[in-house]
């Protein structure tokens, strides 16, 4: 009998959602490949990135993925975007996926340009399509842990899977809106991190709110342009998984991508800023992936390209800004 939810990944976002499910009453078995972290969680019942949060007795921990997913009625992942493929490959060795699998990470794979749901399909095969789901939207982990109101989107290919995921995550303070556009939700969640780095740079250089508003608006336009090429629904990018997530990531002081931009503006290098943040900055890696995809499809994405060049071609920040400001203006929605 399937009795619990298996959770893969125990970073702050993974811990946040695993705690939400456990506090709702579901038994949750959470996995991490980090034995030191698992030992600390088991012994101290506190997460190092959220030390004030008491861990629910419904939440247990393991370094054995098989233990986490065996007899689970649902599996949720919260690893880094770069960790999705290794997780999928490990899953392939130990199970035939036949329960809802919820992706909560955000990113685009480098070199392949694949969204995270597409990686799962490539590794596990098309037979898992009915079981795949995706959760995205404006959801700062610490606010969710504090019980602050939050609205997100859950997407799935299969209506029954969508219903199961919706029911599992829904709470009065964690409102879940159903959606069938997995690719659109995944793309919005990935690209907004790149725009947030640009906003962090603008803030760090004291450009003001007018500049940030322009970056957010034109950034959304870039997201929609790429979404159109990838057969996503434009309304998805206008909703919680697109505009909503973009806004919170570009304006919240808790946003690590925004803070990463601040550090770049202070003169730190890519590696120095990354070390200072101390956690994965997904936008720094998505900038490369998104640039590769845009170049392949011959799509003009100047903000994304600018961040890519700053991070990977050592373009001077001021020169990059000058290039953006000197671009010819054209009709707004072209």
From Swiss-Prot:
Pathway: Membrane lipid metabolism; glycerophospholipid metabolism. Keywords: Cytoplasm, Lipid biosynthesis, Lipid metabolism, NAD, NADP, Nucleotide-binding, Oxidoreductase, Phospholipid biosynthesis, Phospholipid metabolism. It is found in: Cytoplasm. The keyword Endoplasmic reticulum does not apply. Its main location: cytoplasm. The active site is at 192 (proton acceptor). This is Glycerol-3-phosphate dehydrogenase [NAD(P)+]. Catalyzes the reduction of the glycolytic intermediate dihydroxyacetone phosphate (DHAP) to sn-glycerol 3-phosphate (G3P), the key precursor for phospholipid synthesis. Its EC number is 1.1.1.94.
């Amino acid at each position: 009998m399937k009795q619990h939810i298996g959770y893969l990944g125990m970073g702050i976002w993974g811990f946040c959602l695993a705690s939400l499910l456990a506090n709702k009453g579901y038994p949750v078995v959470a996995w991490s490949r980090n034995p030191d972290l698992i030992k600390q969680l088991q012994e101290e019942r506190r997460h190092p990135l959220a030390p004030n949060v008491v861990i629910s007795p419904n939440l247990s921990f393991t370094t054995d993925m098989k233990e986490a997913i065996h007899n689970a009625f649902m599996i949720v992942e919260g690893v880094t975007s770069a960790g999705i493929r290794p997780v999928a490959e490990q899953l392939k060795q130990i199970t035939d996926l036949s329960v809802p699998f919820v992706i909560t990470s955000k990113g685009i794979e480098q070199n392949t340009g694949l969204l995270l749901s597409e990686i799962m399909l490539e590794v596990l095969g098309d037979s898992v399509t009915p079981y795949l789901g995706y959760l995205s939207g404006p959801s700062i982990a610490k606010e969710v842990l504090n019980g602050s109101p939050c609205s997100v989107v859950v997407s799935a290919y299969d209506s029954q899977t969508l219903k199961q995921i919706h029911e599992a995550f829904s709470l009065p303070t964690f409102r879940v809106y159903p959606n069938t556009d997995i690719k659109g939700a995944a793309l919005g969640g990935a690209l907004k991190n790149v725009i947030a780095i640009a906003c962090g740079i603008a803030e760090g250089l004291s450009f003001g709110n007018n500049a940030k508003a322009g970056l957010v608006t034109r950034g959304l336009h870039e997201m929609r342009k790429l979404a159109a090429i990838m057969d996503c629904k434009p309304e998805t990018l206008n909703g919680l998984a697109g505009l909503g997530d973009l806004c919170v990531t570009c304006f919240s002081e808790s946003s690590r991508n925004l803070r990463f931009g601040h550090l770049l503006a202070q003169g730190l290098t890519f590696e120095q800023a990354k070390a200072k943040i101390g956690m994965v900055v997904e936008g720094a890696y998505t900038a490369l992936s998104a640039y590769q995809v845009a170049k392949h499809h011959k799509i003009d994405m100047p903000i994304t390209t600018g961040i890519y060049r700053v991070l990977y071609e050592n373009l001077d920040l001021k020169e990059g800004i000058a290039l953006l400001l000197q671009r010819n203006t054209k009709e707004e929605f072209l």
